[in-house]
């Protein structure tokens, strides 16, 4: 059997592939919200889906439910600058993540 002939479990079960993807997003920040540092419980779209954002690794970051809900579909850069936990160096990281692939 060649590797080209192999069937991978992720291909048979899309939910498993999604679970691995979500886990990799959360691992990026040590399972912490990229905005406030609390435990991440959700995935936030830097460019909201309602404004054309895709569910891609480049557009998704780990977020706590509070930050994800409060940000809603607001511009991430405008929203983040208004937060009491705003950190200029983290702002630059978020900016770099978002603009690396746009």
Give the location of each predicted region.
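Short, charged surface segments at domain edges that flank catalytic/cofactor-binding sites
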Residues: 1-31, 88-90, 94-102
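Histidine-centered nuclease catalytic patch
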Residues: 32-62, 71-78
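A detector for short metal-coordination/catalytic motifs
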Residues: 58-59, 69-102
């Amino acid at each position: 059997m060649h590797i080209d002939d192999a069937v991978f479990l992720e291909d048979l079960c899309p939910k498993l592939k999604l679970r691995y993807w979500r886990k990799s997003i959360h691992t990026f920040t040590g399972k912490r919200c990229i905005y406030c540092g609390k435990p991440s419980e959700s995935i936030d779209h830097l460019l909201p889906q309602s404004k054309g954002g895709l569910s891609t690794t480049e557009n998704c970051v780990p977020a706590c439910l509070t930050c994800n809900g409060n940000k809603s579909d607001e511009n991430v850069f405008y929203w983040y600058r208004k937060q009491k936990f705003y950190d200029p160096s983290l702002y630059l990281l978020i900016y770099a993540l978002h603009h690396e692939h746009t």
